[in-house]
C-alpha cells in the first residue's frame, strides 16, 4: 500500500466519521457542528498567520460580515429589512421551503463574495504594516466593525437581528446545519490542500521567510497577500452565514464580531496544533474545542483559567505547536530528512526562485 492510498484511506475514514457523528452522538450535534466551524477558523487563520507570517487578529471581521450579509439577503428577498429589525422581533416572516432554501443559497453566496471583497479593500489599507503593527491594525479594524454595526439601526443596531425561521422539524434543522458546517470545513480543507500544492504556497512561504528577498526575486508580495486574505475571508464569510442561521439570532459584539472569544480562539487553535501546516490547525482546533467544552461543562467558573493555562503551556513548552514538536522529536515518522544549515539555506533560495518564475 503506497502513501497515496493510505492518505486517501485516512481522508475517507475521517469523512465517514464526520458523516456518522450526528447519528452516533445525537445529544452532541451542535457541539460537533461548532467543532467544524472551529477547524475552518484555524485553517483560514493559518493561511496568513502560518503560511505567510502575517499574524492577523482581525479575521473575525469576515465571519461577522458574512453573517450580516446573509441575513440581509435572506430577509431582504421577501421583506423590508429596516421594518423587520425595527419591529424588535414582533414581526415574523413565514417562509416556504423553497423561499427558505433560496435565501440560504443566495445568502451563502453573498456572504462569501462580500467577505472576500472586504479583504481586498482592507488589505490595501493594512498591508503596508508589518509585524505587531499589522496585528494591531487588523484588530482595530475588527473592533471598529463591531462598533459600527452596533450603531447601524437598519440592521438592528445593538439589539441584533433574528434570522429567518426554518419551516420544518427542529431535528431536521439541526442535521441540515450540521452537514453545512461539515461541508464548509471539508471544502476549506480540500481547497487549501490544492492551493498549497501550487506555486502559490512557495510564494507566500517566501514572503514569510524573507519578504524583501521575495520582492527582489520578482514576487508581487501585495498581490499574494491580498489573494491569501481574500481566500481566508471567502470561507470565513461562508462560516458566518451558516453559524448565524444555525443559532437563529445575530448580535453584533457577542455573536457576529466576538473579537475576544472566537477572534482569539482561531489564533490559539492554529498555534496549538502547529501553524504553517495543513494538519496542525485541525489538530489544534479539535483539542482546543474538546478542552473548551469539557471545562465549560465541568469547571464552570474556572473555564477561562483552564484555557489560559493551556495557552501558557503551549507557549512555553510547544512553541512550534504539537505537530511541530512531534516532527522535531520524531522527524523520520513524518518523512523529514534532516539537512545541515547550508543546504537548508540553499533550498530556501531555490524555493523563492521557483515561486518568482
What is each stretch, according to the model?
Residues 1-357:
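Transmembrane alpha-helices and adjacent helix-loop boundaries
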